[in-house]
Amino acid sequence: MSHKNRLKLGAFLSWLFPKIAKRRAHIVRTNLRLCFPEASEAQIEDWVKQNIRLTTQSFIDRAVLWYAPLEKIHEISCLTGFENLQKLLDTGEPTIILAPHFIGLDTAATVLTSIVPEGCTMYKSQRNPDMDEIIRKGRARFNIVHLLSRKDGFRGLVRFLRKGIPLYYLPDMDFGRDESIFVPFFNIQSATLPSTAQIAKMFNAKVTPVVTRLDIETGIYHIEQLPALEDFPGEDSIEEATARINQLLEEWIRRDPAQYYWVHRRFKTRPEGEADFY
């Protein structure tokens, strides 16, 4: 598929999305209203439109990531700051690549796995076995990528982190009350996985965030590998360190709110007694 047709198909899907996925469009709108109460309704609707356009383009572009030659992937991506990760890999220290749910999440993962010889990440199996196989193969196209199930838990990570094999970790999903703690996210008590802080403390691991932005005008994914967090978690409690991650995520989102993956019900799990937002 040509670059031009790729963007055209993404634009068509963004037009179709609100008509066939009204529930998801509602979730996007609700999340933005919750996180930006100061924004006008016109601004919210503009972000909703932008977010849907970016999200649908990222769906289309998975075909490029999973099937196209590597040079085609490089044509639609621009990686900066890789030296921040390379320094950690050179030392052999346990390393967490902190990858929040921005639109370009999959592009960042594919580009990094094409460079880093070996890595691991958590993976939730799909109900449809055919789709599961497609996704598994797509996410492990280049070099060695270990896809760990949530059932493996920390034990599944131990052998890789101790060998200096980096963990590509997504910190910002709501996996329910049993696996989460409540800490602020945009001033809302949010069920948040404490695993980033727990793993960093347990293995004395360095945490280097990766933040992405899709320029819809050019179709280029800009991938920014940031320096390792200083003194993390340090002397902070697990709750304080997890709140720190959420605060950083807020700062990155505020640069361009439409770039975040708002189609997820980020505030699905509520503290006891609170009403459902969705």
Residue map of PLM features:
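Non-catalytic C-terminal accessory region of glycerolipid acyltransferases
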Residues: 20, 39-49, 87-90, 114, ...
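Catalytic core of membrane glycerolipid acyltransferases/transacylases, capturing the structured
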Residues: 91-151, 177-184
